[in-house]
Amino acid sequence: MTDKYNDWVKNKKHNNYNMAEDPLYYIKSNWVIERQLSKGSFGQVYKAHKKLDPNFVCAIKVIQYCKFTMKEVDYLKKLNDPKFVKYYSLEFNNSKTYAYIIMEFIEGESMKSIIENKKFSDIEIKEIIKELLKALVYLNDKGIMHRDLKPENIMFQNQNQNQNQNNKINLKLIDFGLSKAINENIINKTVKLQTISSVGTTLYMAPEILLNNKGSNSSLDIWSLGCIIVEMKWGLNQLCLQRPNNIPVFPVNSLFTEILNLCFQTEPSKRIKSHQLIKHPFFNDENEQFYNDNKEYFDFLKENERDSYIEIHNTESIGSNSTCSINEIRFENLYLIQSTYENQYPIKTITLHEKYTGISKLSHLNSKFKIIYLFLILLFLMTILVNLNRHVQTKFSIIQRDNIFLSITPESNPIKKPSPTQSSDYNQYSEGSQSSYESSSSSESSSESSSSESSSSESSSSSESQSSEINYSSNSNDLQPTDSSTTDPPVTDPPITDPPITDPPVTDPPITEPPVTETPKPTINPFFNTPVFICSQKIDQCLTVLNSQDLEFIDKKGRDQSMVLEYDGNAEQTFSIREKGGMYICLSGEHYHFSEKLKGRLNANKDGRDCTFNLITQFNIDKQANLYSFRSPNDQYIQSDETTRFISTKPGGLGSQSQFFIYFSHSLGPN
């Protein structure tokens, strides 16, 4: 470079040449220019070293001085992270027409040069995206958006230059000449879009910049990140198919389809944020292991996508649970597991809305295609009706916490009404609590239950009414339907008139008087598929439970035991909650009774926020399965197979101002 410069000076006429016009004239007095590194719309970057200290090598950016120069320097000063180029100093020439930004020299290659000579593997792409997201999160925390994120501005540092000799990808972001503070106008009036954007930069710009020259948040960098993913995965030719009004075109069945769907949202407000995207399970190795351990379930879902659905229990926030069919799953409502291995693609996730959107695009064709368009719309509507009429055959429950999947459980027919035998068993156990089903024929159900106990197992459910009549007419246990059928016409006809005599008991509408809507209804425990009893506001109407059990309610990591339920072991059989508010639960005899102090305040959150509890959480025990679980109204489950401990899947997961209940399984019964 020095020889070139000297030749250029020699070719000039010294009497007409003004040395001040040379941008390198000033910097050459203290620095030795080695070579040019890059050239852009605003200036050039050179590799140089000090004359007095040849070991001090740096990169010098030479640009015409303007207000953008000072902004770039201000942003560089704020960045103190290994993922960004280091800033050293700023110098000017005598007339202040040129500025010289002295920065760290990065020994390595740019992403652009690597893409031209090599194809990245899926694992490498995932690691690069993760590192870029970390850099974008750091920028957002500083209130800065890069605005010019592209392969030319991403440098990969050689391993021998990094002091930490590890196998991780070391990348650095450079060129903050177009950076802006978040919420600042993107395009300044004095600088036109055409002048600040080269052809390469325009390919990575978000639609709001290309169409409106507006944009004031970090979602601009997320769109550019998606463009970089497309180029790393499929090349620049695929990225060139991008149009401002549409999402870029790329192969549908790809490992990165869902990530790109999150990046390529044409509406900036709907585009995912960097701090949200980095928490995606795609970047979590533990979720990959979870996918491999439960691959049979996901394979089943692929084969039976119309007959299955997944219920997700996200323990991070209240009300985040969702249920959807497998062909409607998107990362907006359910995080699926992605694999980093080659030739393994995620479950197909095309929603009905996307199908309709694709069909609607046909409406822009010529009129001769209108008939085809209408036919496809009708076919689409028929598909919706068919899907709505399909009955769910299998459910998969997935427990998720901190973006890590904890368990996946298949359940058959999870929601079904209890059988008559179950209801009779339930009524037996509910006698001690003075509660029963809210049904107009409670006396008939009790007679049916008694008859079912004495009858053989071969009797069908359709003969229940006959068995009730036999029990009503005779007290003997010997039932002979064949003999009674011969004598039925003469003998049982008069008794048939007798039930009208029992019509006065039809004044049992007073029994309906118990609009005992106070008395709770049995429901289905989603964990065990068995009827359970929900306590109403009258807490003393709970079922009988096992006593003499040592129970402890702690969080998963054992942090401070913000809420502890334990058995005191004294003669009064008292269960208590130890907390600042002094709340407790008393076990008297065979029934739980709750203190009024439960309406106090309980500090259950890690950050110290107060939560108000009216009652306690739902409490389930399945004696036969030896399983114990808590459940809150927001479907946050706490389950353990130990008899002495309950493990919480979410410390402090109980929400503020929430109503809690207590559950007991019907399989428990009195001792």
Swiss-Prot record:
Report the family membership: Belongs to the protein kinase superfamily. STE Ser/Thr protein kinase family.
* PANTHER family given in the database record: PROTEIN KINASE RELATED, SERINE_THREONINE-PROTEIN KINASE 36
Give residue ranges for domain Protein kinase. Answer: 31-283
**Positions annotated as active site in the UniProt record:** 148 (proton acceptor)
Q: Where are the transmembrane segments?
A: 369-389
Q: Where is the composition biased (Low complexity)?
A: 427-490
Localisation per UniProt entry? Membrane
Tell me the cofactors it needs.
Mg(2+)
- Which region is the signal sequence? none
Protein name as annotated: Probable serine/threonine-protein kinase DDB_G0286627
Q: Where is this region: Disordered?
A: 410-523
What Gene Ontology terms for biological process does this UniProt record contain? smoothened signaling pathway
Indicate which residues the UniProt annotation says bind ATP: 37-45, 61
What are the GO cellular component annotations?
Answer: cytoplasm; membrane
Identify the main location: membrane
How would you classify this enzyme at the top EC level? transferase
Q: Which organism is it from?
A: Dictyostelium discoideum
| Catalyses which reaction(s) | L-seryl-[protein] + ATP = O-phospho-L-seryl-[protein] + ADP + H(+); L-threonyl-[protein] + ATP = O-phospho-L-threonyl-[protein] + ADP + H(+)
The source's domain of life comes to: Eukaryota
